[in-house]
A protein has these predicted regions:
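Surface-exposed coil loops of outer-membrane beta-barrel proteins
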Residues: 12-13, 74-98, 108-200, 328
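Transmembrane beta-strand segments of Gram-negative outer membrane beta-barrel proteins
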Residues: 14-37, 61-63, 134, 140
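Outer-envelope beta-barrel architecture signal
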Residues: 18-28, 55-63, 107-111, 165-169, ...
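Transmembrane beta-barrel strands of outer-membrane/channel proteins
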Residues: 26-32, 63-67, 113-117, 171-175, ...
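Surface-exposed loop and membrane-interface regions of Gram-negative outer-membrane beta-barrel proteins
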Residues: 37-45, 55-99, 104-105
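Residue-level signature of outer-membrane beta-barrel architecture
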Residues: 51-55, 103, 115, 161-164, ...
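Detector for outer-membrane/organellar transmembrane beta-barrel domains
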Residues: 57-58, 165-169, 201, 205-284
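Outer-membrane beta-barrel "beta-signal"
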Residues: 319-331
């Protein structure tokens, strides 16, 4: 009787755990930028929705979407990096960013198959996420050399990850061209390696005492596409201060952007974040320095307000200042 009772109690506990683990989760994030060059203003909105529905303890269906709308199509300043990482070259009523199945092989190994964006897994650390510069979401040594499946584009493919306390290893294979449309010859469901080629990415991350170090690379199967590599380090100096250093390089004669490098720091004080970063990139002989200074105020668990100043210098042109007020509501 004692054994049977113990067995029943354990079974009940396991059932409760399974019930909790198999609950679907939903999320919504609204990000709005008010941008100004101190002469004109522009507003950009981004709505992101997510749903994760467990089909079993090891298999989960993931569906994420985005919608983008701007007050006008003309950008305030066509800098080479993109000072706002939610700007789109056109309004996007609805697009899938993730749609597929994730298989949790065990506690350390996962495999995803379906539609996905590279910035779901790469260049998405908490420190990089403090900045609004698009180069912090994907280094320009990739975005200029490939039609890569990063915001607002996605592509069909597979993504593998190994994760333990110290190490995280990732490898991805995607259709060689990203899209966000649902119709036409080029759409988000397209998988045509013969015409589009394949994009391969890999990254190693090492974590130690609050610091993180990343080394990655990519290759497109198109004949003249360059190899790229990147490295960045997030060095924790004190519990609330982190130094950031980044470098990206593309190998090949046909490379549009050969080098990208920069450095900065972040500081967290209670409900406030301070982030400063400066970088340099060169595209076809034209270079641009960019500096970002931002302050994030976490008003509540769901609301963040972030004023940002961008200082940009393109070769012989005058220095350009752009201000940005970002409001983010996350549910």
């Amino acid at each position: 009787m004692i054994t049977l009772t113990g067995y029943c109690l354990n079974t009940t506990g396991q059932d409760a755990k399974d019930s909790t683990a198999l609950r679907p989760t939903f999320g919504a994030t609204l990000t709005s930028d008010m941008q100004t060059d101190f002469q004109e203003t522009r507003i950009q909105h981004l709505l992101e929705l997510s749903a994760e529905v467990p089909l079993s303890r090891k298999l989960t269906m993931q569906v994420h979407s985005m919608s983008a709308k701007a007050s006008n199509e003309e950008w305030l300043y066509y800098d080479m990096q993109g000072f706002s990482n939610i700007d789109c070259y056109e309004d996007v009523p609805f697009a899938l960013t993730v749609a597929g199945l994730e298989w949790k092989i065990n506690d350390r190994h996962t495999l995803f198959a379906g539609i996905r964006r590279t910035d779901e897994d790469y260049f998405c650390s908490d420190v990089l996420g403090m900045f609004t510069n698009s180069s912090m979401g994907i280094f320009p040594t990739l975005s200029y050399n490939y039609i890569v499946n990063t915001y607002p584009e996605a592509a069909m493919g597979v993504h593998y990850a190994y994760d333990d306390e110290r190490w995280r290893l990732q490898a991805s294979l995607y259709n060689g061209i990203g899209n966000h449309d649902f119709k036409g010859g080029y759409n988000v469901f397209r998988f045509c390696p013969k015409d589009d080629g394949l994009l391969l990415l890999g990254q190693v991350e090492y974590r130690w005492r609050g610091s993180s170090y990343y080394l990655g690379g990519s290759k497109h199967t198109e004949d003249e596409a360059p190899y790229t590599m990147w490295a960045y380090a997030e060095q924790k100096l004190w519990p609330n201060v982190t130094l950031l250093a980044t470098y990206g390089h593309a190998f090949g004669k046909e490379s549009l952007c050969d080098n990208f490098y920069g450095g900065g720091a972040t500081m967290t004080l209670k409900n406030w974040d301070l982030a400063v970063f400066t970088d340099y990139m060169e595209v076809l002989g034209f270079g641009q320095w960019s500096t970002e200074i931002g302050i994030g105020w976490h008003v509540s668990e769901v609301l963040t307000v972030k004023p940002v100043l961008h200082i940009m210098k393109l070769d012989e042109e005058d220095t350009k200042l752009v201000g940005l007020m970002r409001v983010c509501i996350e549910l």
